[in-house]
């Protein structure tokens, strides 16, 4: 069927190989934007808009990718410009996400296709003239018209409370000019793989009959376990939008790490199966750093949930204190041989899982993960929407990690983790959460 998800089709492995080839050609994210500190706010805007319009995760992740890399190349200096670019990225990304299922193979879309997006003001009469459209793309564009009801209209976007509360209204003329600018900035190639494009394919092998829970007994119901793991994986997938540090990894690595982190949280053994290694071509060692970052965020949210519950109960008079309940009980692990000062930091089930997970790695990892930060020289006035200079960004000598998660209900934690949380060789700088 034409609407069959690609990961369930007969050419799933071929599509996966094509996506893996395309991700190798993705540009490097330099974190040079002078408005990088506003990134999380606009990611939240895109998330809420996509949820309001019921867009798929692939559209949301592609929209954030387009916004990040456009900000990385151009001096978007005003909030009006950033709102306009964000909405345009969402509409363009949704158009591409609707085209992809019709082609059944993401690699079939030409890098120079003339996109005519229903619901937007992009039209062939006013658009620049790219190279000729391949026959399969032209055929698909015609079939795309009957899905116009799935594309949010500009009036629908403007009427949302998210934008109206900011006194923001986007005109068709502004949308047209911004769409054309985005298409030219990406050389008319919007078919870019994101972690959302890989996740469902890896979820096919996420649970098996051979899995054990808590290292002791087999899972009694693989179907329910897989459903629960899918919820975890999609949660971790949304977590990756919150920080540009995940651009340090290839999209397929991030997607596989979401599955790996989910298996760790559900205490499925082994943490990474042979089927997952075969389908993704990644070993646990390849995913270790990315998984650790995701587990730190997960631990943050657990602590926040316990704190919120305690505060709510404290406001009710006559309510006796209740013991803290966790989603699962930590299994009994053998001694890990860690220093006492390091073990003292691990007091929650998730932290115990992190230790056990780290101990399960066979090869010692070397090197550290460094994320770019904006220097003071990048905060000088700029001309609107001009390409950024290719200047190096200084990295501070002492770095720490500030993680915060926005969700509904919104959690606004800002917890500092030193490099000793997992090992002395990893430091995760993330400065984009400063409001």
Curated annotation (Swiss-Prot):
Supply the name of the protein: Cyclin-J-like protein
- An example molecular function term from Gene Ontology annotations: cyclin-dependent protein serine/threonine kinase regulator activity
InterPro entries, from UniProt? Cyclin, Cyclin-like_dom, Cyclin-like_sf, Cyclin_C-dom, Cyclin_N
Q: Enumerate the SMART domains for this protein.
A: CYCLIN, Cyclin_C
Name of a matching Pfam family: Cyclin_C
One GO CC term on file: cyclin-dependent protein kinase holoenzyme complex
Q: Where is this region: Disordered?
A: 120-142
**Which GO biological process categories is it annotated with?**
G1/S transition of mitotic cell cycle
Provenance organism: Homo sapiens
């Amino acid at each position: 069927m034409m609407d069959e998800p690609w990961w369930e089709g007969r050419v799933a492995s071929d599509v996966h190989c094509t996506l893996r080839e395309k991700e190798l050609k993705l540009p490097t994210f330099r974190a040079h934007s002078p408005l990088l500190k506003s990134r999380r706010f606009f990611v939240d805007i895109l998330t809420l808009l996509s949820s309001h319009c019921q867009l798929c995760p692939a559209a949301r992740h592609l929209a954030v990718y387009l916004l990040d890399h456009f900000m990385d190349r151009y001096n978007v200096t005003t909030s009006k410009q950033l709102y306009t670019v964000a909405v345009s990225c969402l509409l363009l990304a949704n158009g591409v996400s609707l085209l992809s299922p019709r082609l059944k193979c993401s690699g079939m879309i030409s890098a120079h296709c003339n996109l005519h997006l229903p619901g937007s003001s992009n039209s062939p009469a006013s658009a620049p003239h790219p190279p000729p459209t391949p026959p399969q793309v032209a055929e698909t564009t015609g079939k795309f018209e009957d899905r116009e009801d799935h594309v949010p209209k500009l009036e629908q976007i403007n009427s949302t409370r998210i934008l109206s509360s900011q006194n923001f209204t986007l005109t068709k003329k502004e949308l047209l000019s911004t769409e054309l600018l985005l298409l030219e900035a990406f050389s008319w190639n919007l078919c870019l793989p994101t972690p959302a494009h890989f996740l469902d394919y890896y979820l096919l092998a996420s649970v098996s009959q051979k899995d054990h829970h808590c290292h002791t007994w087999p899972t009694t119901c693989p179907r329910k376990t897989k459903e629960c793991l899918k919820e975890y994986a999609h949660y971790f997938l949304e977590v990756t939008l919150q920080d540009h540090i995940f651009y340090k990894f290839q999209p397929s690595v991030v997607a596989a790490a979401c599955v790996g982190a989910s298996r760790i949280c559900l205490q499925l053994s082994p943490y990474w199966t042979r089927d997952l290694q075969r389908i993704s071509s990644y070993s646990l060692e390849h995913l270790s750093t990315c998984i650790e970052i995701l587990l730190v965020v997960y631990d943050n949210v657990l602590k926040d949930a316990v704190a919120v519950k305690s505060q709510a109960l404290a406001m009710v008079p006559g309510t006796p204190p209740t013991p803290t309940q966790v989603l699962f009980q930590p299994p009994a692990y053998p001694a890990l041989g860690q220093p006492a000062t390091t073990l003292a930091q691990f007091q929650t089930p998730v932290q115990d899982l992190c230790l056990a997970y780290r101990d399960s790695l066979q090869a010692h990892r070397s090197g550290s993960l460094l994320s770019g930060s904006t220097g003071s020289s990048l905060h000088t006035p700029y001309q609107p929407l001009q390409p950024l200079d290719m200047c190096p960004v200084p990295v501070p000598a002492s770095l720490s990690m500030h993680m915060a998660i926005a969700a509904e209900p919104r959690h606004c934690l800002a917890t500092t983790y030193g490099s000793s949380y997992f090992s002395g060789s990893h430091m995760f700088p993330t400065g984009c959460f400063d409001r």
